[in-house]
Amino acid sequence: MSIRIIPQDELGSSEKRTADMIPPLLFPRLKNLYNRRAERLRELAENNPLGDYLRFAALIAHAQEVVLYDHPLEMDLTARIKEASAQGKPPLDIHVLPRDKHWQKLLMALIAELKPEMSGPALAVIENLEKASTQELEDMASALFASDFSSVSSDKAPFIWAALSLYWAQMANLIPGKARAEYGEQRQYCPVCGSMPVSSMVQIGTTQGLRYLHCNLCETEWHVVRVKCSNCEQSGKLHYWSLDDEQAAIKAESCDDCGTYLKILYQEKDPKIEAVADDLASLVLDARMEQEGYARSSINPFLFPGEGE
């Protein structure tokens, strides 16, 4: 099953009602999103062997919060949604949608916000990005979207992605359409932008007990039923792994049919759990899954594969 975004004026009244039963999509709620992520990263940094890197990621997340409100995006996506709906494509498809210069404006604003907080190699990286040409930055963005990680150093990628993510999240937040679920292919990718998930979460509140995958780019969440591989949609050979016990708030769901895994975070076990922060802070579980022979089916926006990985 895939999820297609339907323009508002094409939805009948019955579709509007049924769409409210199980929301197939949860568009990004940007208010305090990055501040919450930064706070969670700082909290998880305590007594964590990755503490320094988690605090570094928290600085980027906080900068995203500041830049988000200093540089709002105004854009009418109505025509784009209609066109994408007719083609059966994500409206903000990273492989098709032309990038506006706004994302590079966001990158420069992030660099300006982060410079006073950075030193050593990290400062050298953002100064290098600051001096890069417009075309060089576009080439790096294209390489990341094509999963050509060998073309973008892993120390530059988080900064480039942070700006791209802000831009795509702003656009996703402006989508004036609704979404409905219909059968199709490639449910493992974000139905809004076509990017990969970072993790999945079993939620509380109005979506109690439902699993949503969280996009690592536009921050949209989309519904995928539990006990089904989010990568290949098979259900016969799933296994669940944790470092603590069966009641752990973070587990890895592995699939022997496709040989991949994705983390599942349980809000009922820890209401403060956060899709990006807790995924990054639990890399020990990733190491265990790699030892077991499984490949990760997601990418964390603060941790990209380097050349040869």
Swiss-Prot record:
GO terms for cellular component: cytosol. It is found in: Cytoplasm. The keyword Plastid does not apply. GO terms for biological process: protein maturation. GO terms for molecular function: ferric iron binding. The keyword Cytoplasm applies. Keywords: Cytoplasm. Transmembrane segments: none annotated. Signal peptide: none annotated. Its main location: cytoplasm. Belongs to the FdhE family. Necessary for formate dehydrogenase activity. This is Protein FdhE. It comes from Escherichia coli O9:H4 (strain HS).
